[in-house]
């Protein structure tokens, strides 16, 4: 457990010692805020809820989370520090979990910084805070799914750009599987069980 905590602290610290963390958080907050209040027509809708906030999370994660995961293992492989890491008295499980939890916690911090939007909704009306809280939990778990994909792809390449592009593509495909336009296309010729299987693989279906 101590080794897992050590990897977690090391990885989390590496985020905040570089501009990456701050750039990610600023872009995330700017995109989410813009999408919620402008594209989501927050004020025009006249409803005290955060539907227009959460609906854009899968699409924002498609680009931003691969930017976080692209360096998890690709950088270690490129610089050769992965050999040093593997010589330490820890298991592969400790290394993988430590890096994953650190990146997941980083996303958690970014989500916490969106709480002013939640406060704004409560100031403007009387929302169902239970649903909003559940939305945050769901978004965090969805982010974990994106992180799993990005981490896996980062582990098989030394090039961070390749890791980013491939992770973005895979996350995009998994998200698009739940879009009505795509599902309607498959309904034209595919059996129902296949359509349901494709739909169940999408992040949109479960969020």
Which role does the model predict for each range below?
Residues 30-36, 115-117, 170-180:
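Aromatic-anchored segments of alpha-helical transmembrane domains
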Residues 34-37, 44-50, 54-55, 60, ...:
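Secretory targeting signals
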């Amino acid at each position: 457990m101590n080794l897992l905590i050590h990897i977690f602290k090391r990885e989390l610290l590496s985020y905040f010692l570089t501009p990456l963390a701050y750039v990610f958080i600023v872009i995330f907050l700017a995109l989410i805020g813009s999408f919620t209040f402008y594209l989501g027509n927050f004020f025009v809708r006249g409803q005290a809820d955060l539907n227009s906030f959460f609906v854009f999370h899968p699409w924002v994660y498609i680009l931003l989370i691969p930017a976080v995961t692209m360096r998890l293992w690709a950088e270690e492989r490129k610089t050769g520090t992965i050999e040093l890491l593997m010589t330490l008295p820890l298991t592969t499980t400790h290394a993988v979990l430590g890096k994953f939890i650190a990146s997941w916690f980083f996303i958690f911090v970014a989500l916490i910084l969106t709480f002013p939007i939640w406060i704004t909704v409560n100031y403007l009306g009387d929302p169902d805070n239970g649903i909003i809280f559940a939305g945050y939990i769901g978004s965090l778990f969805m982010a974990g799914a994106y992180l799993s994909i990005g981490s896996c792809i980062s582990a098989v390449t030394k090039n961070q750009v390749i890791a980013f592009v491939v992770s973005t593509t895979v996350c995009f495909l998994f998200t698009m599987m739940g879009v009505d336009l795509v599902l309607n296309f498959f309904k034209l010729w595919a059996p129902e069980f296949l359509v349901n299987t494709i739909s169940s693989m999408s992040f949109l279906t479960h969020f």
